[in-house]
Swiss-Prot record:
It comes from Sylvirana spinulosa (Fine-spined frog). Its main location: secreted. This is Brevinin-2SN1. Disulfide bonds join 69-75. Antimicrobial peptide. Active against some Gram-negative and a variety of Gram-positive bacterial strains. Active against fungus C.glabrata 090902 but not against C.albicans ATCC 10231. Shows hemolytic activity against human erythrocytes. Expressed by the skin glands. One of its GO terms (cellular component) is extracellular region. It holds the Pfam family Antimicrobial_2. GO terms for biological process: defense response to fungus; defense response to Gram-negative bacterium; defense response to Gram-positive bacterium; hemolysis in another organism. InterPro entries: Antimicrobial_frog_2, Frog_antimicrobial_propeptide. Keywords: Amphibian defense peptide, Antibiotic, Antimicrobial, Cleavage on pair of basic residues, Cytolysis, Disulfide bond, Fungicide, Hemolysis, Secreted, Signal. Residues 23-40 form a propeptide. Belongs to the frog skin active peptide (FSAP) family. Brevinin subfamily.
Amino acid sequence: MFTMKKPLLFLFFLGTISLSFCEEERGADEDDEVEMTEEEKRGLRDKIKNVAIDVAKGAGTGVLKALLCQLDKSC
């Protein structure tokens, strides 16, 4: 019985090592997908920020023109 335990323990040990390597590779693949989504989010955030800045500039210009009109009383 003792002679059977050593090979079984050895096979169990090899199986655990190979399983841990598979999990590490799978984790590395999943990390790449996460980075892509973060890059996409960053790009989307930049686009939204640029649109908001353009809208604010347009609104600010309109408000300044209205104030100038009120101050000059040329309306």
